[in-house]
Amino acid sequence: QKLMKCLSKQDETGVGDTKSVAPVNTIIQSIKGVSSSKEKDSSKVKSLTESVDTFLKSRYDFRYNVLTEETEYRLLERMEEGFAPVNQRVLNTFCLEAHESGISCWDRDLSRCIFSTRIAEYHPFKLYLEELPVWDGVDRLAALARRVSRDQLWVKEFHIWMRGMTAQWMGVTGSHANSVAPLLISTEQGYLKSTFCKSLLPPALQRYYMDKVDLTSQGHIERRLAEMGLLNLDEFDKYAPTKMPLLKNLMQMASLSLCKAYQKNYRSLPRIASFIGTSNRKDLLTDPTGSRRFICVLVEYPIDCEGIDYAQLYAQLKAEILAGEHYWFTKEEETELQQSNMTFYRQGPVEDVLRDRKSVV
């Protein structure tokens, strides 16, 4: 503005005011200095960003987990150790290493790179299934089911359920959620029921298994359906009959509408997790109409949980789904489930009296 006033004054007189020339030149030089300073600052920021980016890429491999919403890293020199989440402690270590390499930066400079959209996204379950080998054609599902029981109906039902679990991981279920849950039952202790449930997930996906399922908060369990791969209703008999309507509703959900703590808006997320359960009691079911949601199986012997060929097991399931094999239970198969589950109903007071009278007669 001062420059414009001086120039305007010169225009009015028609003659340059020698007294005002010096201030005008000073203002021009000042403007040039500010502009030059901004260019230098911009150049420094760009140089620092490039230095930080080059430093990180020279030492680490990064990826963004869309399920946990975490950035993960691994050392390029020790890639066999796998990925781990980037937390504040790790970020501070990155910053110290950058300083030791001669880069003058703050942890916020590193954060801008690490927690940006420049880090490639990945879905743990889809990545695992994409990297599977081609199925060799050998059926491994029947043998896995027979580790629990030799009952032929169980072998067939378990196979369908495993397809449903894998289909949810693949994101191809559409309107057919995996709405059925196997219940492994034995009155004897030490049959490794819970261990078998956990062993169904390959090592690369073990962190997405949970056996502490809280049915007191619907919002909490819905988040787990979107984040985990398998939820074990361990000691199924501890859940009150009043919780069964909520559980059956959760089992039928194909998609979820969630709002996380740090977010303002709800968003639709696909369901990933399936249910499984264990119990040491046989009298589990209370609702005959809801029994089609469970595959009750009596465990006949301690379960062998070792030596599972995960790569070929899931390659088989993936191949069957892509070939069009159904991963949901038909009406006929649901009827078979209800008939098979008759021996696992919980007797009420009236049934107990009638049973006692029959035994006397």
Task: Label the model's feature ranges.
Residues 67-71, 192, 279, 290:
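Glycine-centered small-residue hotspots that permit tight backbone geometry or close packing
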Residues 116-226:
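P-loop NTPase catalytic core of nucleic-acid-dependent motor ATPases
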